[in-house]
Amino acid sequence: MTSSSKSRKSKSSKASKAAKEAPVSASRPLSKTPPPFRNQVIDKRALKQLVAWSYKNHGTAVTSSMADNLKDLGFKYATQAAVSISVDDLKVPEAKKDLLGQAEEQITATEERYRLGEITEVERHTKVIDTWTETNERLVDAVKKNFDENAPLNSVWMMANSGARGNMSQVRQLVGMRGLMANPQGEIIDLPIRTNFREGLTVTEYVISSYGARKGLVDTALRTADSGYLTRRLVDVAQDVIVREDDCGTTRHIVVDAEDGKFGSRLVGRLTAAQVVNADGEVLAERDTEIDPPLSKSFEAAGVKAVSVRSPLTCEANRSVCRKCYGWALAHNELVDLGEAVGIIAAQSIGEPGTQLTMRTFHTGGVSTAETGVVRSKVAGTVEFGSKARVRPYRTPHGVNAQQAEVDFNLTIKPSGKGKAQKIEITNGSLLFVDNGAEIDADVTVAQIAAGAVKKSVEKATKDVICDLAGQVRYEEAIQPREVTDRQGNITLKAQRLGRMWVLSGDVYNLPPNAQPVVGSETQVTEGQVLAEASQRSEYGGEVRLRDSIGDSREVQIVTTAMTLKDFKLLEESTHSGEIWNLEAKDGTRYRLNTIPGSKIGSGEVIAELADDRFRTGTGGLVKFAPGLAIKKARSAKNGYEVNKGGTLLWIPQETHEINKDISLLMITDGQWIEAGTEVVKDIFSQTAGIVTVTQKNDILREIIVRSGEFHLCTDAKALERFEGDGQMVNPGEDIAKGLSVDTMKYVQTVETPEGKGLLLRPVEEYTIPNVAQLPELSHVKQANGPHLGIKATQRLAFKDNELIKSVEGVELLKTQLLLETFDTTPQMTVDVEKAPDKRAKTISRLRLVILESILVRRDTMSDSSHGSTHTELQVEDGVSVKAGDVVATTQILCKQAGLAQLPEATEADPVRRMIVERPEDTTTLSTSGKPVVSVGQRIVDGDALAEGETASCCGEIEAVSGNSVTLRLGRPYMVSPDSVLHVRDGNLVQRGDGLALLVFERQKTGDIVQGLPRIEELLEARRPRESTILCKKPGTVEIKQGEDDESLAVNVIESDDAIGEYPILLGRNIMVSDGQQVTAGELLTDGPINPHELLECYFEDLRSRKPLMEAAQEAIANLQHRLVTEVQNVYKSQGVSIDDKHIEVIVRQMTSKVRVEDAGDTTLLPGELIELRQVEDTNQAMAITGGAPAEFTPVLLGITKASLNTDSFISAASFQETTRVLTEAAIEGKSDWLRGLKENVIIGRLIPAGTGFSGFEEELQKEAGPHPDILSEDPAGYRRMQNLRPDYTVDMPPAASASAVLDDPSDADLEATRTRHNIDPSASNFAAFTRPDADNELKEEQVVDAEAVEGLQEEGLLSDE
């Protein structure tokens, strides 16, 4: 030990000498006192302090060597002491047994209260969880105490206690108990793990424990991703915040208040914005003083309540932050340097701890009582509430009836004997467990004091109450159920008051849908007796077919309608593609079947198509309708056009080859006459003779058309003109041209050929189409009422008038189809296609279409718990005919156990679906020694009085009292809380496991979105919460009004001008203000999350009515900024992470820097434009000078993503998100990017304007300043940090950059010499006149040329004659 401390001393003395010799820096010197001698156990915290002290006073080198020595020291002694960990070091405290025993007792008592219906399921759950949580806490204390007293040098304890490894929660799991676990949904399982890892877990505990472990792993994985993305967004929003100025000179500031008289580290590293004075007016610090820890402590000592400090939030530097507003760079506790990228540092500081924040905590269900103080009575006596006392009944989360104070008052306990009265201060919201005037003993819990009027934000949650036994439901009077209709018209039943719902035991039978009970209510039944009977009937009647049964049911099919096509034989034909079925008529016409036997078809579908070659063409061609032929107008021509009226169809054949090949492959010329079989294009041959037309585009052959017919060269211009274009039909015997007539119908067209113009007479084919298609003969079987079938034949033309069919192969012009028609069917009904043998000739098959009604009949079940045993009988045989409404099968439900049958009341809307049999074991008879004090119909629970001095041992409803015996029908009570949704009505029958009610309860919003990463994200993204709190818009006095329907409340705020602001409060919202309270704008009227946008609006609207626009905007923004910074800090603090305010302020500044222009006034701004507040301010100042109308605007809050996308730099925005949108908009608006931030410069590939690259940036700024050398004579700002630099950096001071070179670049000495020789007055002459104005320099000032100077320079040969 001695040697190392010596070496450390010598080193530190050297370092301090060195420090003394070094020049003292400009900032306040830190304390140079030697470290105080620490006579204590050095644990993690003390080590941290030691290292920090050394770093501050002696720099890095000394500190690192000291840390090294400390490490060696630690290892040396750890080795000698042999600190290791073994199983024997895990000592389980003796107290564990007792603690667990007490917890078990409490829980048993709670379970008993639940069984007796004194508390609801929710209250039971809450109590169990709170009991275990408390036991766990007490066990941790026992563990600490055990180690501290019995084994202070135990390795495990030393590690956890010194902070070297592990923490108390881990030690708790090793030697205390593992505690409660959450299931994957985040609800806590109310079965805790009672053992620890030393004792070992049971199998069940191990499985439950692995839930929690998995949750931890998944959470960590998600958290890293989320936190990384948060950091990326933060960096993007703040990357262009760089310290660019020394002092912006602002007078604006923020105020830091002392918390409990202490500032902690919140002032350290800031600069004061005004003098700080103590109560006597003595100045403690001037403006712009850096506050270091001693100064902060002296403020506390002087009792300063609040200090005004400069902050990045109020800095007026343009698009950056100045050194004095930012304060210390926390890395080395000195004023921040110019060119420091403080935005990036802020983003990393906030993003990095993100991984330490929990994603979501567990839903504890219920609120643990840690934050409230329990007060017990010190004396026995009488309780007296003060005169101002106002209380209301309240039921605690554990189901204890108490009272809640509505105002602050004093409670006194007057002692019954001698002694001093005990006074207790009761605050608003505290719970009282005693009544006014009650006599109490000493050490009784009197009250639970709430920590201030903290109304926590709560959320609605629900829990189902599941029935544990089958039986009949009975409500207690107290419940007072009422029907509530929601917007959709659904009716729900809700409990109005706290009360019990009973389930009286019995055997409940579920009846099938159409079953009728065959026994009356209140009749005795025996085992095996039929209780109810269900019958299944045929709807339409018909012929019965029994199918083979499948599974536990069998199908009865009834043929309702059948139709046979008796003229057609059904033939099967095999082809390579599968089976084809044909229908053949007597005359040999064939129809091809579109379906196969055994399949189903619907109405309007095609059954078969006529296979007819009469309407098949040889090639493609042109369709023309002769007059008289008409088709139905159809929406889609997919299936062709239905023929309305028969007639003649004319067909002009032509052959079309679709080619799409290069023109070089063409082997004929356009307009040429060719014979059949000519090769027109390589490997493509014409099938007919005729005239060729070639279509080509861009040297690609598209089509070749061959039009057949007779070709006549013609010179008659009139005739040629007549048949130009599409051509015309010519009837037989008509003259076409001189000496040319036709004897059959022709289609004539004018064509051009290599030989010259002529007429082409094309043949026309005629097809006759009948008016109607012939229908086959049918035989039909159908019922008197019910569905029936029909067949309809239709003719469909594939093409319409004047349609050109481009094809080489032939096409079918007309299709004749048979369609199925159905009448009076239901949508679910389908038609079955069957193959049926002919009645007379068995070898011939016919096509039959049938409609079947299918009835599923259940098989017998022996005894299924809820249906009893059933017995099913079929009442029909295969092949018989039944009428509509005949019974096909009957099912009987048999009684399982003898007893008394009871039926619930049936209504039209609600037929009997269940019945109950009260068995002997559902009742019990209790005998009493005295006369019973109970009456029939009364419901009692364990412990209620039966007779004098005798209590009941079970729960139920009294059915009979005779002499000294009481007959009780067993039952079970369930407590339901007000506003619960009741799933069953009074008298309903329930099976075990049915839901009885849905309890609606409030639980504290779990620390969840209220904490951790999701909350940080919600704040920084400025998200609008789903159901936000109601905010007060104008200041005033609160008045709470009841709504018209006694349900809703309204808060009225009487404002200063006697106007009344009305705020209706929705159901389920808690009001956070009380009658007569004074409220300010932006104050919360109800609980719930705050919408930050709405808050900003409230602040701004209120301030706008009293202050000028600019001030109102600045103040509203400042209020919101303060709120945001506090909220973000709260989340981090709750998780034990400390971040300096200034980092959050830098980010919040970026979020609140813009305003939205509402009315542009006379400025060039656009309404709706988002623009920096500073820009608007400058614009409006300019307007004020010129007398124009200023722009009106409202401040806006942008989330970090929005803010990143709305930066001035489009390069930065595009590299973040929505690249295309950002770039397109920037291009359309013609934006310029000034490359001010880091990202833009990195993307373009320039030096970044921070750190060492900052000076270059400064020079560019100076270039913008134009040709004024006097600006350059000051030392460039980037090097003002010279004196603050650490000794191990050296920087060469560069020469001041000149604006732009004089033409022949004379040196300063030359110029000076010239001046002296020519007696030029240096003050009058302007040498800058000889500098060329930069091309991009807009300051091309009018500069007077000094003639004398020019002459002198020319004589010296320093200036060319030009």
UniProtKB/Swiss-Prot annotation:
It holds the Pfam family RNA_pol_Rpb1_4. Zn(2+) binds at residues 248, 315, 322, 325. The keyword Zinc applies. GO terms for molecular function: DNA binding; DNA-directed RNA polymerase activity; zinc ion binding. InterPro entries: DNA-dir_RpoC2_beta_pp (IPR012756), DNA-dir_RpoC_beta_prime (IPR045867), RNA_pol_Rpb1_3 (IPR007066), RNA_pol_Rpb1_3_sf (IPR042102), RNA_pol_Rpb1_4 (IPR007083), RNA_pol_Rpb1_5 (IPR007081), Rpb1_funnel_sf (IPR038120). Coiled coil: none annotated. It catalyses: RNA(n) + a ribonucleoside 5'-triphosphate = RNA(n+1) + diphosphate. Residues 15-27 have a biased composition (Low complexity). Residues 1-14 have a biased composition (Basic residues). DNA-dependent RNA polymerase catalyzes the transcription of DNA into RNA using the four ribonucleoside triphosphates as substrates. This is DNA-directed RNA polymerase subunit beta'. The gene is rpoC2.
